[in-house]
Amino acid sequence: MLFRSRISKQTIRFHTGVNVETLHSLLSKQVYAGLCFADTSCVTCPEEKISAEAEAISETFIFTLPEIRGLLATDVEATFNGDPAAQNLGEVIFCYPGFRAIGNYRIAHQLYKLGVPYIPRMITEMAHSETGIDIHPGAKIGHHF
């Protein structure tokens, strides 16, 4: 192996924790910006209140990640089982634009349900521009899509 990974069985929990902390910090800042931009009275709104709301939303979102992962697993399975040309699950994950669109949607939908302004639509529009598939973050799509 040319480049040895520092991640091992012994360090995976540490690395995951660091990444989750980074996600929480970055997402909190973006949610804060979205909340401020959406609130036309934000000039008079206490910064601490919006900051606390953004952090709470980010934390709640992070706790939904296992649920999102589970839904995506059913989506991969459904796509693989429904397409005789699919060689394996990895091909569906890495090569199918529909999976990219549904992945972005699943993340955006959770943020949408949490009341985050702007960001969910931006996430689905990223997939739309890359794949041509437009899914509104408020759409209700069950498992095995």
Task: Identify the function of each model-found stretch.
Residues M1-E125:
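Terminal amphipathic alpha-helical/low-complexity segments used for targeting or macromolecular assembly
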Residues M122, G138-A139:
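Short loop/turn and capping residues at structural boundaries
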Residues A127, I133, A139-F145:
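A structural motif detector for beta-strand N-caps
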